Amino acid sequence: MGLIKAAAGAFGGTMADQWKEFFYCDAIDKDVLVVKGEKRVGGRSSNKKGSDNIISSGSGIAVADGQCMIIVEQGKVVEVCAEPGQFTYDASTEPSIFAGSLGEGIHRTFDTVKKRFTFGGDTGKDQRVYYFNTKELVDNKFGTANPIPFRVVDRNIGLDIDVSVRCNGVYSYKIVDPLLFYTNVCGNVEQQYDREEIEVQLKTEFVRDRKST
């Protein structure tokens, strides 16, 4: 008899979450790296009690050019799609990956981080849809805060002097492995992860690499 309450609760949750939703992401702004997918529920939909972070089996998920979509379940990546189009979420199937232009490297990362979960009674799941901006992010300015001491030596003319050098310019970058970015950098963001959150770190490493060369 100890299963009655859990069974009743599970049944009620299933009834509330059984209707299809549609997850999508509008064009991602150039200053945004990751954004949580929006759930579209029509005004005539009866699915008003569905859990916020539950994806109903049969839900549609749209992916646009320049985006990579991942589904995260209990903090672990279980689905990846970098191919533009519309897809149907089927909870009964094994994890899938549509690598698109990301290539074989994303397959290896996916094999490393994926993990399936099973629960009894309540759903016990937190499922989220995230979209990554995979376009090239341009016009990132950098510059040395202070002059860099540099020694100039030319033994042919007997030159050996110390000079100070400054440098500045722009660079671009893109997210080539969204799974690594999720697991090592952004994690479960509430709504979105902006490029300004890693801007200082990127500039510091970029200038440091220039100094070493």
Where are the model-predicted features located?
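N-terminal hydrophobic membrane-entry segments
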Residues: M1-S212
